[in-house]
Amino acid sequence: SNMFSGDLIQMGDIYASELDYNENYTKKQLDRIADYYQIPKRKKKKAELIEEIVIYENDLSNYEITERRKLLWFYMEEINNDNYLSKFLILD
C-alpha cells in the first residue's frame, strides 16, 4: 500500500501542475514552454498542450531540463519586474 500512496501523491502533483498551467498561463506562454522542450504543438488545444507538458515534466529523465527551464523562466520574470533591466528584455 506504500506504493499506492506514492502514486496518489504523484497524481496530486500532476493535477496541481495541470491546474496551474490552465489557470495561470496563456496558450502563447504554453507554446513557448513546448518549444523549449521540443514538444510538437501543431493544432493542439490548450488542454492537450498542458497534458503533454506535464507528462514531459514528470518524466524523471527530463528532470534537469525541466528544472533549468523553470529557473530560466523565473529569471525572465524577475528581469521583467525590474524597472531598469526590463528595458533590455523584450518578451512579446
Indicate residue ranges for each PLM-predicted region.
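Basic helix-extension-helix modules of the SAP/HeH family
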Residues: N2-D92
